Amino acid sequence: MTSQPTSSLQGSCSICFEDLKQNDKISAIVCGHIYHHGCISQWIATKRQCPSCRRTVPKNGFVEKLFFDVQRMGGEAEKPPEIDYREEHYKLSTSLKVEQEKLGTLNTENKNLKDTVKSLEKKIIREKDKYRQEIPKLQATINHLTISSEETAYLKRELQESKNRLKTCEFYKILTVHSSEADKQLGEYLKKNGNLDTEKFFQLMKSTNKDLTDKRREAAKEIEQLKMEVQSLKRAAQEDAAIKKTLKKTVLDLRERANVDTPINNKRLRDVLETETPPPAKRKSMGFDESSQMIDPDGELSFFKQNENRTPVTSVPSTSKAVLPFNFDDDEDDEYFKTPKIAEKKKKLPEAMAPVSEDSFDFDIAVPQSIINRIPAKTTAQPAKKYPKIPNLSAKTSSKPTEAPKTENVLKIKSKSQEIAQKPQKSTRISSFFSRTTSSTSNLTEYVILD
């Protein structure tokens, strides 16, 4: 038995390009073209035109399903195959769920994208507003910077011109110093454009620097000479100080020698020491400390020390003229009156010691009136005094000039009651300015200490 060939349709779907089969669901549109039902349904949902001829398809302008009655070659009609609808339903349901899930995902993404687009649109609007507000500010800044740049360029030009003028002024000053006709010579150092000729200016500066260098050298030489003069003056001052120190030491030595056991061999000195002097009329020392205020080992005070404890020199009243210091500038025996003050032999002064107010000598000498006027006035009458004679002394001077004189053989004085009652007197005698002491234990030799 021979097999008979099955009948089939000869055509294809223009959308999916698959063959059209008899058992497929085939649909047709108003223009006459046929497609798979699923393909044309999706197409019409997207765009209502025919995929082949681009004819507009109305809402109900297509046939959903076509049926074809194709007979076999033997003339018998072909039986349609049996279809399992349950399996088809399951497949379609599964495909529908998958597509729904995809649709939900796409909807979510679409929503998110829409939100993003909205936020971006708002941001764009904000940025536009911001830039619209910034544009005038930036434009004003640009204008300000443009004006500032123009002013800066102008100031730079002015600065350059000022520098050129300053150079010209300095050059003119230098030229004025070196030349009396600066205005005439100024044209020689300037170019045609008015700028300074640097080469000629440098030459002038070199000559100026040379002159200043010469002046500096001369000043340095003068400074060296002045330094040498200062050094020589310093050396001379040091030498003068040394000489002064030596002379002072010599004077002190002479004063110490005058305080040593020295016999009175000078006639003029003896004549001067002959008369008595009131106690308050003590003369001032000749630039040094007083040396007559000495204390002997036995505690007896000298004549002037006793008077000083009793009545200070500043309290002596002056009757006619001010008491002036006694001056021996014209005397050749001045060194005898300059005696140092020996402080190491001082002791505590007795409070009740009465001053000695008389010195007795056996010869007399006239005293000038100027010296008499310096002596305080006589307050009480003086009793008659007996003057002891001073014998001729032939003893040699002591070998120890710095030894203090002894007061064992001092001249006899009156009793203490008479000394207290005695007042200062004005006399024509100068011997009261000095205290007489002895320098040895012998009763035959007498010595005098000069103040």
From Swiss-Prot:
Q: What molecular functions are annotated in GO for this chain?
A: ubiquitin protein ligase activity; zinc ion binding
Task: Name the principal localization, coarsely classed.
Answer: nucleus
One GO cellular component this record assigns the protein to is: site of DNA damage
Q: What keywords would UniProt list here?
A: Chromosome, Coiled coil, DNA damage, DNA repair, Metal-binding, Nucleus, Transferase, Ubl conjugation pathway, Zinc, Zinc-finger
Q: What pathway or pathways are given for this protein in its record?
A: Protein modification; protein ubiquitination
Q: What is this protein called?
A: E3 ubiquitin-protein ligase trul-1
Q: Recorded E.C. number(s)?
A: 2.3.2.27
What species was this sequence derived from? Caenorhabditis elegans
Q: According to its UniProt record, where is this protein located?
A: Nucleus; Chromosome
Give the family this protein belongs to, as stated in its UniProt record: Belongs to the TRAIP family.
Asked if the Swiss-Prot or TrEMBL record annotates the protein with the keyword RNA-binding, the reply is: no
What GO biological process, any one, is recorded here? DNA repair
| Matches recorded under InterPro entries | TRAIP_ubiq-protein_ligase, Znf_RING, Znf_RING/FYVE/PHD
